[in-house]
Amino acid sequence: MREWVLLHYRVPSVPSARRVYVWRNLKQLGAMLLHDSVWVLPYTAWTYEQLQWLAAEVEELEGEAALWRAQLILPGQEEALVARFVAASEAEYAPLRDAMAAEEPDLADVSRRFLQVRRRDYFDCATGKEIYGILSAAREE
């Protein structure tokens, strides 16, 4: 069974910049929205630390935040959640595959974007490995 870290938060609706700030940070981490304001990431020391910092920022923004470590118990739930994370990573990698198929791909740009997506690819999806191989081969040419 995997462990997960969950963040539940609430920030004042006005000004909306506070909510947008928190949302952008969660998206940048690759967190998945479970329900309303409950977000989840696979538990690692790094994801836990990032959500601790974000929870502290929520409180500085005059909001409330709660952070949990949890396990999914019912059959199939964990697999479904992992599948959501993998699908999100696959969707982020797709434009990189397209960029590498161009006549003269911008390797620096694709590499930079690859590293950004790779940081959110918590389950090492197949497309990420494929893009890495394509980038490695292109650099050797």
Residue spans for each PLM region:
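Glycine-rich, aromatic-bearing surface loops/beta-hairpins
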Residues: 113-141
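Positively charged, polar, low-complexity stretches
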Residues: 1-100, 119, 135-138
